[in-house]
């Protein structure tokens, strides 16, 4: 536990408030180490500060200055007057004001914000847990609780009053069944239920209230605490042994990319550096157009019939390709890695206006079955360079909101490619550039329902690809 705390918690306090920082840290230390490991695994950081929250570096930008947040009790507060906040997104962090936390109500708020961070920002809980039948069944039991027996039984609202937010109580009638579609359409409301249950379970003075008024959600949290948090954490560790996958988390991805490819970058020539930067700007289009047109080959004297100006432009592109090849041949990816790429229906030779895979946020299942039937197990040679990202949907220009298909690509150790974001004109895309000439195989097609706010309520088609190993050692 000490090592996890040391790697996860950052102290930003003066020496005269050190006692309060210790008491604040003790709140965190009471949680299962598996919970903290899951948060750390996605690049999450916990800051304990004696500053006003909006003065902390994580929250000092203008978007947080006048923000209002909602407490576990549904009350709205200006962020600048509150004492804890879980910042979500691709670089999650929890900022806690250093206090003695003698008030149990304050402790509940700290655990509530951490519970939000766990269910909203932490993989795989943020993708799967709200759709877990155990969670759904527990919600339904609480929503169907009754006082008394038989015909005289009446609705027991205690569990709903304790855990459901105002909007959920208004939209979900007592006794109404909850299903995955309802959860997908009301993500923040059900994240609140999880976070509130989490907070009451781990704050000792409120644990009994959760058990008395919402026994099904108490038992759900009990199972998570005693068994499933550990199982989930162990599963993540095991998968990370086999393949590196940063999901949406940019802080960890950027750190790995910069450190792993630092020596490679230092050994590039000026011409190689220039073309990498140029490729991330306007040069990628003519380069890849040339490679697609000639199936990845540089054809001698191909511009023989062109005028002098056109011939010179063609030779320039060919030299750029040679420099880019030389740069990427110097680099090999050091471990099995998952990268991401958003595409349109054109990936499968379909035009949007003719095919329209997604309508009103819903993926057409029949068209997915058609694509799977035609392409699963098939291979294709990527004659041009492939731009991918270390993280899913790093920028709104390439996101689920615009492109209905996500390629999740497994890159085996030894493939020629490099992290080029710190050399790019668009560093926020966290680009991994994969060398040309590899053969890719379509492995799996699956429809993903929206489980995160970033999905904009839209389903998308996830297509798993891998590099065909028989082609791994192909040299240019």
UniProtKB/Swiss-Prot annotation:
Residues 2-226 form the ATLF-like domain. The active site is at residues 341, 387, 398, 431. One of its GO terms (biological process) is symbiont-mediated killing of host cell. Signal peptide: none annotated. GO terms for molecular function: glycosyltransferase activity; metal ion binding; metallopeptidase activity; nucleotide binding; nucleotidyltransferase activity; toxin activity. InterPro entries: ADP-ribosyltransferase, Anthrax_toxin_lethal/edema, Anthrax_toxin_lethal/edema_N/C, ATLF-like_dom, MetalloPept_cat_dom_sf. Keywords: Glycosyltransferase, NAD, Nucleotide-binding, Nucleotidyltransferase, Plasmid, Secreted, Toxin, Transferase, Virulence. This is Putative ADP-ribosyltransferase Certhrax. The lineage of its organism: Bacteria, Bacillati, Bacillota, Bacilli, Bacillales.
